[in-house]
């Protein structure tokens, strides 16, 4: 016969669960499905009774053993199963039953009484309902309250749908919300690391009165410390009885006299404080990385009803936001791109020295361009180990790479004599010859054949490219407009360029950085 596990399923435990696990599961389920916390819906009442019945059987070792063996604790059903088993073993003429009905005695407790007894609260069984410090009544004759009160009738001043006792170790507390904050950091701060101070406004339990609102509490005489009042009314031959929250103590069962009110929190049980937190940003931290300060959130939160509720403190979650850097961009967490490295035409052809300022390390980066290595406009070169600090599985592992994008600035024109010299030099270069030999249009004979294929050829000399008057004209070709804008931009940039200093450009840069600096890196660059 397959084992019946419906009682275990009600508590959401397995059949092999220990007594402590069953007790813990019952506590959580009873608090979750208690009718007072679910607006006394029919589903919550049914579920609560089912949970209590399951716990009443499974907490008792003898009843649990019977349930595990027979799948029920009903005396009649068990006797039938025993008789059937004996008939199968001894034959059809044997019939006897040694079932002990003593194990089937149940305490006369309602679900509300069982719930109150489990949480060490006073409970008084009643034919109309269960009256306890939880004030759960099945007759639902009045709007019930739900307050946790310990055996001595003491609770704190936090009240919403429930009043929590700060001294009840078995009481379940919800986790409070996290406090979120954004921390803006520059690229240099992420490279070097930093320590920031964060001012946080939060609500904490009063350390003087431990959340009770006073050092001395008095028992409410109206409800005699129960937190509830029972009233009766005679209607002819019938007597109606109902329970409601005590109006004098608010259901707490106790109150604090004015002379005993805690001066630190003024009887509230909590205080608002401003905490200065030290936030450490590790070197190599990334954009949108989280820093979690565990348990630094609010210990008391406000409820929708205007009250306050004690909670498990949430965390302070800080999100790192990297500010935009004008010169560098981070890719793949640890690599850097230098977006604006301008070099002149001569350096791109003949080599030289290029300096990069503003590196997040605070160092001046010196790049030696090898003569003969032509730098094309927009090309990338790699400087190893000059990126951001790199981490692998949380362990620091060197640095990323620095990728430099070169922007070549061309002169407006060259002197004809120098242009002729450059042409003669380039014509005899073996690399130029090899490249020209691979181009179909490099040979002049090809141009001759091209000219012969046309009836007429007009020959012109380029002049200054002047932008047309666009006041009364519409240009439909977007490429022409882009070409004009690019030409004007280059013309303005080259107008500021002093042609007399072209030959002394490298010497000027060396003189510029001759003063002492905090650090100086000299690197060769590699192809990207």
UniProtKB/Swiss-Prot annotation:
Subcellular location: Cytoplasm; Nucleus
GO MF annotations, alphabetized: ATPase activator activity; Hsp70 protein binding; protein-folding chaperone binding; unfolded protein binding; zinc ion binding
Record function comment: Putative chaperone involved in protein folding. Interferes with propagation of [PSI+] prion when overproduced.
Coiled coil regions, renumbered to chain: none
Location (main, coarse): cytoplasm
PROSITE patterns: DNAJ_1, DNAJ_2, ZF_CR
Lineage summary: Eukaryota, Fungi, Dikarya, Ascomycota, Saccharomycotina
The species this protein was found in: Saccharomyces cerevisiae (strain ATCC 204508 / S288c)
Name the record gives this protein: J domain-containing protein APJ1
Keyword Ribonucleoprotein carried by entry: no
């Amino acid at each position: 016969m397959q084992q019946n596990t419906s009682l275990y399923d009600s508590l959401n435990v397995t059949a092999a669960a220990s007594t402590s696990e069953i007790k813990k599961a019952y506590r959580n389920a009873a608090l979750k499905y208690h009718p007072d916390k679910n607006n006394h819906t029919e589903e919550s009442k049914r579920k609560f009774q089912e949970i209590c019945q399951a716990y009443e059987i499974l907490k008792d070792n003898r009843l649990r053993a019977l349930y595990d063996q027979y799948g029920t604790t009903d005396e009649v059903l068990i006797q039938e199963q025993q008789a059937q088993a004996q008939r199968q073993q001894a034959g059809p003429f044997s019939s006897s039953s040694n079932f002990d009905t003593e194990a089937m005695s149940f305490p006369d407790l309602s679900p509300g009484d069982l719930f109150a007894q489990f949480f060490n609260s006073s409970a008084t069984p009643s034919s109309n309902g269960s009256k306890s410090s939880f004030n759960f009544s099945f007759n639902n004759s009045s709007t019930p309250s739900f307050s946790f009160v310990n055996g001595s009738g003491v609770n704190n001043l936090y009240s919403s749908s429930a009043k929590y006792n700060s001294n009840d170790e078995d009481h379940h507390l919800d986790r409070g919300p996290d406090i979120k904050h954004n921390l803006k950091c520059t690229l240099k701060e992420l490279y070097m690391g930093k320590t920031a101070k964060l001012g946080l406004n939060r609500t904490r339990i009063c350390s003087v009165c431990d959340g009770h609102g006073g050092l001395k509490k008095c028992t409410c005489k109206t409800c005699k410390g129960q937190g509830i009042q029972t009233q009766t009314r005679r209607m002819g031959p019938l007597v109606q009885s109902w329970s409601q929250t005590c109006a004098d103590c608010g259901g707490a069962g106790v109150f604090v006299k004015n002379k005993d009110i805690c001066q630190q929190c003024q009887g509230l049980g909590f205080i608002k404080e401003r905490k200065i937190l030290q936030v450490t940003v590790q070197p190599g931290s990334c954009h949108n990385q989280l820093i979690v300060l565990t348990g630094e959130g609010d210990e008391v939160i406000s409820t929708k009803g205007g009250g306050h509720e004690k909670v498990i403190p949430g965390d302070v979650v800080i999100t790192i936001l990297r500010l935009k850097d004008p010169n560098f961009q981070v890719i793949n967490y640890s690599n850097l791109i230098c977006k604006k490295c301008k070099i002149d035409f001569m350096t791109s052809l003949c080599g030289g020295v290029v300096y990069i300022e503003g590196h997040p390390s605070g160092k001046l980066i010196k790049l030696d361009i090898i003569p003969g290595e032509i730098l094309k406009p927009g090309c990338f070169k790699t400087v190893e180990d000059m990126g951001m600090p790199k981490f692998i599985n949380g362990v620091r592992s060197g640095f990323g790479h620095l990728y430099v994008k070169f922007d070549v600035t061309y002169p407006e024109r060259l002197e004809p004599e120098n242009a002729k010299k450059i042409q003669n030099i380039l014509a005899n270069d073996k690399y130029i010859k090899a490249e020209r030999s691979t181009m179909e249009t490099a040979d002049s004979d090809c141009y001759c054949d091209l000219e012969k294929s046309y009836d007429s050829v007009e020959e012109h000399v380029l002049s200054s490219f002047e932008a047309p008057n666009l006041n009364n004209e519409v240009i439909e070709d977007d490429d022409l407009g882009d070409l004009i804008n690019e030409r004007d931009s280059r013309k303005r940039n080259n107008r500021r360029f002093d042609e007399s200093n072209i030959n002394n450009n490298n010497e000027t840069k060396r003189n510029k950085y001759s003063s002492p600096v905090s650090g100086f890196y000299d690197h060769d660059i590699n192809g990207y």
